[in-house]
Amino acid sequence: MSYGGGYGGGRGGGNGYGNGDSSYGRGNSYSNGYSNGGSNGYSGGGGGGYGGGRGGSGGGNVNGYSGGGGGYGGGGGYGGGGGAGGDRMNNLGANLQKQNWDLNTLPKFEKSFYKEDPVVAARSEEDVAKFRAQHNIAVQGPNIPKPVETFDEAGFPAYVMTEVKAQGFPAPTPIQSQGWPMALSGRDVVGIAETGSGKTLTYCLPAIVHINAQPLLAPGDGPIVLVLAPTRELAVQIQQEITKFGKSSRIRNTCVYGGVPKGGQIRDLAKGVEVCIATPGRLIDMIESGKTNLRRVTYLVLDEADRMLDMGFEPQIRKILGQIRPDRQTCMWSATWPKEVRALASDYLNDFIQVNIGSLELSANHRITQIVEVVSEFEKRDKMTKHLEKIMEDKDNKILIFTGTKRVADDITRFLRQDGWPALSIHGDKQQNERDWVLNEFKTGKSPIMVATDVASRGIDVRNITHVFNYDYPNNSEDYIHRIGRTGRAGQKGTAITLFTTDNQKQARDLVNVLTEAKQVIDPRLAEMTRFGGGGGGRGYGGRGYGGGRGRGGGGNFSSSNAAPLGGGRRW
């Protein structure tokens, strides 16, 4: 069957990351990426290294890392002045022109493509209810299409199905079974599903079909599909999926996020892209400076809407949505359904239909074994080491360690490396190219231990993480569920180990509720804590956070944590 084929072969090439210029920067600024001259690509005695021409004159190499003093960014530190920085929040969008939309004069567009397969149509309401119950699918709203049980029943055109089948998936995930017919029908959709449920493909494939039914982009046109995401990591992850499945249609995309130079992103937007995946701050920056516009957007996705609101992006999201025609199709995806997300949906989605996988109550993935140990603060490192010794007996294991602050993340990484463990850390003060490198080392298993702050608790999609270790308990149970959701994905089992102190006592009751719902064993000392209110105030460890401002040469950035030499007694 066909969905209209405006695109055919008439689309330019250059799809994917950066359209021809994905380098990390040139010349003195980054010393050709990772800086030549040192073993393992580290700065090794001169050159600008990452620090942007600040020196890097370290002494001899130790285990391939530059020794004494210089290290990765020399005395200036990795951040070289401001750290990686996220999207700028202050006054964003102040110069955006208010749009007055007259739907009578706007060009019409097609958004309804779903034609129910005869096999699906023949299923009784009883069969449909049984399928939904088996797969924990709950739906709300009028005239919701029946779920599909196979890829072929979804009725995607051949150019999409070829790519899907090449991935070797046996059948659609529950969110895809119900979400594809909903999204293809052109309706506004709210999807509530845990991380790792397959939601990215649930909106990506209908987006590709949508694009192929629209007129070709003209010079100066902005994107047709806009995907908003909370973090750079998630944005890049989404881009990889769209690149993979949009390849045969020659759909062009770009990823627009802060913390990296704008040049490549601006060039992509100027050439014309059908899909723009963006974090809110950098996108507003691009619109305000006239580098793109959202007049052609007819398919909008808000991914991890709850996380975007948690991170304070609501004013930016509302400004962006005001730049998009109101008769667009909007798909909103979220792991949870708090009142803030409900308010956003009711303000910006029209007559939406909703699909929910699992309970709307705060609940953890039941494939994850949750172990919570009540410890004192000074016991933590010893406990962590003992767990690592056991976990890393299996060389295929990958462990993600969460800390409450950037300082603790760097301290722990340095401690582990000096103890011989191949650990690297990632957090908001690391420059983007360091974060990319660390993530790649972790993904490929070269460094199977990654220490992270909550910047990585959502939006980093690394397959086969076998263990999550909460060195510090997060501020609330919702973040706890998001953190441990990095393991046990795509039908796999996982293990989450959490160190819980009296400082976290305020969170004990919520945590016990999560553990009870998932039928987990509860430490008697944790159960005891729930009898008392008050307690340590739930501040988490480390108080004020660390490192905002000037960068810290040799103190907590690449030169002293990720580039710390591995101790002599290698542990792995």
From Swiss-Prot:
Q: Which SUPFAM superfamilies match?
A: P-loop containing nucleoside triphosphate hydrolases
Q: Which residues bind ATP?
A: 193-200
Enumerate the catalysed reactions: ATP + H2O = ADP + phosphate + H(+)
Q: Where is the composition biased (Gly residues)?
A: 547-557
CDD domains found in the cross-reference section:
DEADc_DDX5_DDX17, SF2_C_DEAD
Motif stretch (DEAD box):
303-306
- Covalent S-S links between cysteines: none
For the biological process aspect of GO, one term held by this record is:
nuclear-transcribed mRNA catabolic process, nonsense-mediated decay
Its job: ATP-dependent RNA helicase involved nonsense-mediated mRNA decay and ribosome biogenesis through rRNA processing.
Query: PANTHER family attached here?
Result: ATP-DEPENDENT RNA HELICASE DBP3
What is the protein's given name? ATP-dependent RNA helicase dbp2
Gene behind this chain? dbp2
